[in-house]
């Protein structure tokens, strides 16, 4: 893919492709890679240094397979155990998630791999724990609870942020200029690349595939 992307012999602009992978508990899509506990177990262990070491080891194994980008860490604050993706969260305490976020980003990007803070924002706080549901909070509560990990990740220089499938007070996060531009960039100071989740743009009105 990479060689084809930079080939300009037939008039292509030669823009190099970048490939990302969900290495969320080790390089879990590769047979023989080291698998680690999911985030909920790491949060329970309460050891940010251990978690950063796991992130660095994961990044090295991802790099060894020629991939430059990891879709991690997940910075959800899981507020309802009925949410089916609770295992992806470090826990239900915003301060705990914040403690882990920056170190994981530093560890991954210190190994030359692009990290992704995800899923912005409020995926762990949907009404009744419904996956891809509606997070019904004021902006202040949204940021004070579900934004703390992003503050830490951005301070650590995270290069990418992934938009979330959920809605905020009835409006889909994908395509939400206020949250993805005004808040994420204008207020939180993120200056990197925002990526959609899997076909997330297909959930935006007028953008159906």
Model-derived segments and spans:
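Glycoside hydrolase catalytic-domain context in secreted enzymes
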Residues: 1-209
């Amino acid at each position: 893919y990479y060689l084809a992307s930079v080939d300009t012999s037939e008039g292509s602009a030669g823009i190099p492709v970048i490939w990302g992978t969900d290495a969320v508990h080790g390089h879990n899509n590769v047979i023989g890679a080291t698998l680690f506990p999911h985030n909920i177990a790491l949060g329970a262990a309460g050891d940010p240094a251990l978690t950063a070491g796991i992130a660095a080891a994961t990044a090295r194994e991802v790099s060894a397979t020629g991939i430059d980008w990891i879709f991690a860490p997940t910075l959800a604050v899981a507020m309802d155990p009925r949410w089916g993706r609770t295992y992806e969260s470090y826990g239900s305490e915003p301060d705990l998630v914040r403690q882990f976020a920056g170190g994981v980003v530093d560890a991954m990007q210190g190994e030359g791999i692009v990290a992704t803070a995800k899923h912005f924002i409020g995926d762990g706080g949907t009404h009744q724990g419904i996956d891809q549901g509606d997070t019904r909070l004021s902006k202040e509560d949204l940021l004070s609870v579900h934004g703390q990990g992003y503050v830490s990740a951005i301070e650590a220089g995270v290069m990418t942020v992934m938009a979330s499938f959920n809605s905020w007070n009835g409006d889909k996060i994908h395509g939400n200029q206020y949250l993805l531009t005004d808040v994420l960039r204008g207020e939180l100071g993120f200056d990197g690349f925002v990526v959609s989740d899997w076909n997330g743009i297909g959930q935006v009105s007028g953008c159906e595939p």
